[in-house]
Curated annotation (Swiss-Prot):
Originating organism: Enterococcus faecalis (strain ATCC 700802 / V583)
Molecular function GO terms recorded: carbohydrate transmembrane transporter activity
Stated family: Belongs to the GRP transporter (TC 2.A.7.5) family.
Keyword terms of this UniProt record: Cell membrane, Membrane, Sugar transport, Transmembrane, Transmembrane helix, Transport
Source domain of life: Bacteria
Localisation per UniProt entry: Cell membrane
Name used for this protein in its record: Putative ribose uptake protein RbsU
Function, as annotated: Could be involved in the uptake of ribose.
InterPro entries named in the record: Sugar_transport
One matching Pfam family: Sugar_transport
Membrane disposition: Multi-pass membrane protein
Transmembrane segments: 5-24, 34-56, 63-80, 95-114, 121-139, 154-171, 183-205, 220-237, 244-266, 276-293
Amino acid sequence: MNATALLIGLGPLLGWGLFPTIASKIGGRPVNQILGTSLGTLIFAAIFSMINGLAFPAGMDLFFSILSGVGWACAQIITFKCFTMIGSSRAMPVTTAFQLLGASLWGVFFLGNWPGATAKLLGAFALVLIMIGAKMTVWSETESAESAGIMKKAVLLLAVGEIGYWAYSAAPQATAIDGMHAFLPQAIGMVIVAVIYSAVVTIKGGEISPFIEAVSYKQIFSGFFFAFAALTYLISAQPDMNGLATGFILSQTSVVLATLTGIWFLGQKKTAKEMTVTIIGLVLILAAATITVMI
């Protein structure tokens, strides 16, 4: 692995690691966050496509690419809602664990991954590590019945959101184009969902329309971080860079940065014991991610 490949591989660490913290710091409601983030991603993707002269997909390639973006936006709305419930430092490890579980199970049952008894045994061990790690990251020394109920609700919501994240990663596999050509249509799908969601909130009334709130457009900045991470991951996963396996592992390190910056910069405090358990949980999740791609 050369220095250039390593730097590109660490792009998702910075982009996806800082994205949840920046989006939470800028503030606003989930509708503001998804609208701004999607617009930021669209701007980034459009500029990238124009600079590189990428042809715009058509037919089913376009459909599945847009569907991918729709899935991500739906899932991200749920994740943003969970940020308000339990904080990004707790939500991110859980949603990362669900994404790893979803991707692994999809690969085993539908793509023929992990052939042989040994591979399946190692894979099952990795999945157990993921679940243990996720549980450890949300552990609390003192938790009231009310906060425990909120946590359970958030975890269930994040599990539902995994359907959207699964569509985000699985839909492009049905196309005949690479990730860079799918990037702009994905962003269009994200904006479609964000605009519809914002319109529904506006029509329902009772709340300020997100279209006229400044915070919605401030969130464009957080969208640049998400888009940067998505693009550098696509480049990192190329065979002549880090390859899919190493690129994926490097990208998953973002959960560590997202969790720690949420604790340090958003006031999502943990006791010394909770911090120790959280870090161990993060290590288990990363170890499991490494196992799943090395089988």
